[in-house]
């Protein structure tokens, strides 16, 4: 009768289909979130750069569009 719990514990320890640890899943989520944030920052920087160029061209052509 005492062998049954020991056998069950050994089966659980030797299970080849053990789920990923919580720490590994958290690390993967953080890496994925970091890449998403990096993409957003690059896109915002790119768009603001385009707006600055467009604003400077507009100010050279017509001073009424400048924010001075």
Swiss-Prot record:
It is found in: Secreted. Its main location: secreted. The keyword Signal applies. Pfam families: Chi-conotoxin (PF16981). One of its GO terms (cellular component) is extracellular region. GO terms for molecular function: toxin activity. Residues 1-19 form the signal peptide. Contains 2 disulfide bonds that can be either 'C1-C3, C2-C4' or 'C1-C4, C2-C3', since these disulfide connectivities have been observed for conotoxins with cysteine framework V (for examples, see AC P0DQQ7 and AC P81755). Expressed by the venom duct. Belongs to the conotoxin T superfamily. The cysteine framework is V (CC-CC). This is Conotoxin Lt5.2. It comes from Conus litteratus (Lettered cone). The lineage of its organism: Eukaryota, Metazoa, Spiralia, Lophotrochozoa, Mollusca.
């Amino acid at each position: 009768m005492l062998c049954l719990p020991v056998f069950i514990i050994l089966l659980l320890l030797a299970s080849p289909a053990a789920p990923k640890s919580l720490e590994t899943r958290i690390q993967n989520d953080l890496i994925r979130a970091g890449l998403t944030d990096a993409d957003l920052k690059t896109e915002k920087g790119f768009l603001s750069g385009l707006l600055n160029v467009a604003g400077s061209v507009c100010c050279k052509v017509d001073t009424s569009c400048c924010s001075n």
